[in-house]
Design a protein with these regions (language model features):
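Partner-binding and oligomerization surfaces adjacent to conserved cores of proteins
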Residues: 1-225
Length: 225
């Protein structure tokens, strides 16, 4: 069983991902939420010390890849899709397969996690820390994958995960404000995938603040030279 998740990116990096069939894994330094990975009340110094020991150990060996369950969120396009000038990659990933690191839905809540003391810092808590965020982030509808940093990084110090059975590219959605020339480059990058990957354009509804998938470029593309 699989489910569809979405990765927003600029057109430049998206085209590179399509051509090289891979996505970049993020380290803790790349994350944009200072509470990420330790959403815990650490008023007690003993709790703080124990939690830090757990989380620092995790991030010596793991990296993260973030997706959304939705492709049509206007804010996600603005924040991660280069202000609607980028693209969105749709992947099918395994659901509930213990052999993978997928299907980790983020939990959103109003308050920090609470524990009685350092004796409660264990594997189960570490798992909750990895997937708990403040409710203000709930618009992202985030799904996380955790990968190992066992392979050496590339020359720029970056780690990657290859497209494959557990990261199956199924669709590419071109942003509503993507320039026609860039759109053509995206289409060319998709061609080697054949019928396995569907290309869409994000269209703007005329009667609501909503995006829709279209199988053709928006009409305004024809007026741009």
């Amino acid at each position: 069983m699989r489910k569809r998740v979405y990765k927003f990116t600029s057109a430049q990096y998206g085209i590179s991902n399509l051509e090289k069939k891979r996505l970049k894994l993020s380290t803790i330094e790349d994350l944009n939420d200072p509470f990420d990975l330790c959403p815990l009340d650490t008023t007690d110094p003993a709790v703080s010390k124990a939690a830090n020991a757990v989380t620092s150990g995790v991030w010596k060996t793991k990296a993260i890849l973030c997706f959304s369950r939705n492709w049509d969120n206007l804010l996600l396009w603005s924040h991660y899709g280069d202000s609607h000038k980028g693209i969105c990659l749709g992947f099918d990933i395994p659901v509930g397969d213990p052999g993978t690191n997928f299907d980790t839905d983020v939990i959103y809540q109003p308050n920090l996690l609470q524990i009685r003391g350092p004796e409660d810092v264990n594997f189960d808590l570490a798992n909750r820390l990895l997937r708990t965020k403040h409710e203000s982030w709930s618009y992202e509808q985030e799904v996380r994958m955790f990968g190992l940093l066992s392979d050496p990084p590339d020359a720029k110090g970056l780690n990657w995960i290859e497209f494959g059975p557990d990261l199956l590219l199924r669709e590419v959605i071109i942003g509503a404000q993507c320039h026609p020339t860039v759109s053509k480059d995206v289409v060319e990058a998709i061609k080697p995938y054949g019928d396995a990957v569907k290309c869409w354009w994000a269209g703007m509804r005329t009667d609501a603040f909503l995006l829709v998938k279209q199988d053709h470029p928006p009409h305004w593309h024809a007026t741009v030279r």
